[in-house]
């Protein structure tokens, strides 16, 4: 074979190998051809899988609003392609938000040193947060890690939102039972635009008539005012405001303090008890 012939054969084999590599590289994403994860714990999903996850988790969380894992999955499945990027861009457009994205802090019982928070001044953000956790019987260590958002930076944004959620509870004083969660989710929806926070409001149908009336007349109007008027909560560097007065922080964020749900329910129970006692006395 001539030099020219050998060169042609080599080039043909190289072209064939390159074509095979390109075909392999461009093979469409499917269940049988799942790309490698973009970060530890990441689970890439097809469009069909993402839709099924969103539908299944939405139905499951409506049936049982206490399933935090389903609510987390719903949040991730519905956050892309637009909403989580909008939230990430809101952080990039803010000096504090950019620092949070650069530092990547995590909120856990170890990083916050809960023992120290309980020694802070009574009305400080840190003490308020610790008292709220103790009262509600929850821990900052219970938040699931993000796994269904493809973009690594956006995955952190979702993780940050998830871990900051209890701070929102603490500064507003809202409890974790359904009535309090819905009030906070309404505020979060107007502040973050994450679909999951809006979809969570469908749990309204499971509330008792008195709770529905209370929500519509007291806490929904509060959530609308505070949600539309407040600053982007994702840009609060909570680790740096732990010693700040909580009333001062609410004023800076332009968030009103909502009616105390626990106190309202306590008063209603007392009224019902007195009414029952009066009825018993009347029957005797």
From Swiss-Prot:
InterPro entries: Coq4, Coq4_euk. The keyword Nucleotide-binding does not apply. It is a peripheral membrane protein. Its cofactor is Zn(2+). GO terms for biological process: ubiquinone biosynthetic process. Zn(2+) binds at residues 165-166, 169, 181. It is an enzyme of class 4 (lyase). Its EC number is 4.1.1.130. Lyase that catalyzes the C1-decarboxylation of 4-hydroxy-3-methoxy-5-(all-trans-polyprenyl)benzoic acid into 2-methoxy-6-(all-trans-polyprenyl)phenol during ubiquinone biosynthesis. Belongs to the COQ4 family. This is Ubiquinone biosynthesis protein coq4, mitochondrial. It comes from Penicillium rubens (strain ATCC 28089 / DSM 1075 / NRRL 1951 / Wisconsin 54-1255) (Penicillium chrysogenum). The gene is coq4.
């Amino acid at each position: 074979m001539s030099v020219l012939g050998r060169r042609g054969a080599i080039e043909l084999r190289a072209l064939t190998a390159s074509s095979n590599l390109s075909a392999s590289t461009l093979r469409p994403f499917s269940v049988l051809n799942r790309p490698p994860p973009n970060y530890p714990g990441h689970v890439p999903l097809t469009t069909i899988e993402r839709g099924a996850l969103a539908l299944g988790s939405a139905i499951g969380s409506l049936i049982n609003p206490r399933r935090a894992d389903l609510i987390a999955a719903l949040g991730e499945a519905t956050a892309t392609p637009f909403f989580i990027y909008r939230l990430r861009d809101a952080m990039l457009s803010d000096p504090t938000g950019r620092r949070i994205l650069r530092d990547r802090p995590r909120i856990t019982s170890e990083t916050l040193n809960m023992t120290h928070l309980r020694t802070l001044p009574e009305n400080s953000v840190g003490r308020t947060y610790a008292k709220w956790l103790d009262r509600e019987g929850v821990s900052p260590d219970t938040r699931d890690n993000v796994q269904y958002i493809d973009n690594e930076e956006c995955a952190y944004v979702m993780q940050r939102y998830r871990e900051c959620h209890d701070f929102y509870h603490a500064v507003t004083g809202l409890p974790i039972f359904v009535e309090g969660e819905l009030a906070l989710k309404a505020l979060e929806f107007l502040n973050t635009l994450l679909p999951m926070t809006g979809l969570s409001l469908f749990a309204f149908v499971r509330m008792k008539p008195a709770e529905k009336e209370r929500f519509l007349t007291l806490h929904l109007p509060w959530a609308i005012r505070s949600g539309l008027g407040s600053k982007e909560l994702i840009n609060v560097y909570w680790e740096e405001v732990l010693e700040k007065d909580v009333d001062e922080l609410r004023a800076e964020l332009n968030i009103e303090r909502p009616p105390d749900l626990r106190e309202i329910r306590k008063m209603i129970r007392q009224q019902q008890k007195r009414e029952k006692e009066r009825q018993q006395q009347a029957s005797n």
